[in-house]
């Protein structure tokens, strides 16, 4: 007979304690990272982050657009690197969705980047090469290029510090095919995990050769992981 009121009182006290704890949370960022505290964004277009041979056998310069909150004085900012959609055959760093999402996150206080990465070339597609093998290779190239962009920012943080990013807070993301590439960056770390028909070793392995080599004095470990 006494247990029910006691349990009710205990639950009431627990609820009150949780409410008090929630009220005691202190906002240490002034709304940064979850509210658009910056009205304007500054964009550096066409920043070269690497180069690599594409599916057409041409050495392609890899470019990205970097978005930063205007008049931001913070010394070290987290950076989010985005890869666009398009099924590894189409799309661009300037796609409307990429521009929108990069702008929105930059207004929250992040440094953001939208990258162009190597796509399956049109000649291969119309020549009958639009198949599982070539799409898989394009997915690997996209992952390698995204890794190169991550290495670019970590190398920059260790050298010129142009973009003032925190090398410990580098985030990758994307839309559709770009999201797939981001998942590969996060979870694919062994050549043995890739089907043999892809021939990943000939493509440059997991890290790739798209730029900013993973083993340098500034970054003695694979910089993209």
Identify the residue ranges that each predicted region occupies.
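N-terminal cap/lid segment of alpha/beta-hydrolase-fold proteins
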Residues: 24-75
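Bacterial Sec-dependent N-terminal signal peptides
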Residues: 1-28
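Primarily recognizes the serine-hydrolase "nucleophile elbow" in alpha/beta-hydrolase
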Residues: 148-225
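Cap/lid segment of the alpha/beta-hydrolase catalytic domain
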Residues: 88-97, 116-140
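Coil residues (strongly favoring Ser/Thr
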Residues: 28, 100-103, 132
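Short beta-strand element of the alpha/beta-hydrolase
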Residues: 75-86
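Serine-hydrolase catalytic-loop signature spanning alpha/beta hydrolases and amidase-signature enzymes
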Residues: 87-90, 112, 152
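Short amphipathic alpha-helix adjacent to the substrate-entry channel of hydrolases
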Residues: 94-114
């Amino acid at each position: 007979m006494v247990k029910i009121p006691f349990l009710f009182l205990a639950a009431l006290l627990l609820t009150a304690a949780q409410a008090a704890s929630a009220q005691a949370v202190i906002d240490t960022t002034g709304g940064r990272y979850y509210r658009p505290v910056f009205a304007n964004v500054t964009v550096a277009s066409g920043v070269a982050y690497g180069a690599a041979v594409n599916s057409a056998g041409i050495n392609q310069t890899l470019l990205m657009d970097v978005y930063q909150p205007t008049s931001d004085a913070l010394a070290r900012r987290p950076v989010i690197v985005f890869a666009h959609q398009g099924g590894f055959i189409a799309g661009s760093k300037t796609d409307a969705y990429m521009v929108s999402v990069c702008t929105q996150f930059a207004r929250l206080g992040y440094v953001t980047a939208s990258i162009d990465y190597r796509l399956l070339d049109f000649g291969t597609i119309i020549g009958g090469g639009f198949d599982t093998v070539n799409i898989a290779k394009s997915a690997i190239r996209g992952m390698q290029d995204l890794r190169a962009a991550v290495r670019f920012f970590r190398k920059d943080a260790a050298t010129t510090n142009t973009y003032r990013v925190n090398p410990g807070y580098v985030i990758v993301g994307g839309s559709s095919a770009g999201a797939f590439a981001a998942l590969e960056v996060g979870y694919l770390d062994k050549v043995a995990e890739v089907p043999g028909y892809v021939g990943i070793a000939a493509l440059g392995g997991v890290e790739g050769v798209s730029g900013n080599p993973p083993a340098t004095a500034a970054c003695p470990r694979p910089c993209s992981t």
